[in-house]
Amino acid sequence: MVIIADSGGSKIDWRLLKKDGTIGQASSSGFNPYYQPIDHLKKIISEALLPQVSERVSKIFYYGTGVSSDKNVQSIQSVFAEHFPQAESEVGWDLLAAARALCGHEPGIACILGTGSNSCLYDGEKITGNVANLGWILADEGSGTYLGKQLIFDYFRKEMPESLAKQFHARFPWSREEVLEKVYQQEKPGAFLASFAKFIFQHLKEPYCYKLAYKGLSDFFENNVMKYENYKNLKVHFTGSIGFYFSDVLRQVANDKGITVKNILEGPIAGLTLYHQKDL
């Protein structure tokens, strides 16, 4: 059996590839070693994963956030070694998950467009380039946070069309002070800002919302994809909620810039399941 984990801060998607070709699955709360103790992962494995394991585990592929340090990688591997001492384990970051899920064994540019954004150059086996990720305050172009931040800016600065502003206020009747408190004083401000992307998507037929989305995605291409050498000769792929739901706008922006977009997935787990069939 091969176990695959796609881990984010809020949830982990598990897939269990069995010798007979069937695929088991499980879902659990998320894990980030920078913010949660390693015992949290142990509990997740015991409660959510182990009940689904019905045969010997030979390999484990764990992709997630917070695995940039060797210490965190070793901590995660040690937990798997406790539960599956006979299994080999590989721990990789979420960008590698995106590259493998989207590109498979072909070279290309893999992008994440969700709450945040990121991209990498992939040679078919490994990541060979990455435009520096500066987070939601400095960058994250095209992300839900980026779009939501612009929407909030336009609303309070009265740049949003009046009819749309009335609809926005009816749905989010917050004062400027309440919004500033959520952004500057409460937890997960990026996720809060990204939550407004749904409003943009639901009003994409409004010229204002379409232009906002187009501009945000154009900024992503210009500051990420177009920084890679030879980008026009490579296929560009996307995963993440913004890439998935705004795919029509995304493809239009790419077409206008002479860029070829191929795969767009809401999440990487299905692509990872296909990629790791060879490891059975």
PLM regions and their residue ranges:
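Cofactor-binding loop segments of dinucleotide-utilizing enzymes, especially the Rossmann-like FAD-
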Residues: T65, D94, S241
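Polybasic, low-complexity association/targeting segments
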Residues: F61-S68
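ATP-binding/phosphotransfer module of carbohydrate and carboxylate kinases, centering on a glycine-rich
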Residues: M1-I60, L102-I109, I152-L280
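Phosphate-binding/catalytic loop of phosphoryl-transfer enzymes
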Residues: S68-S163
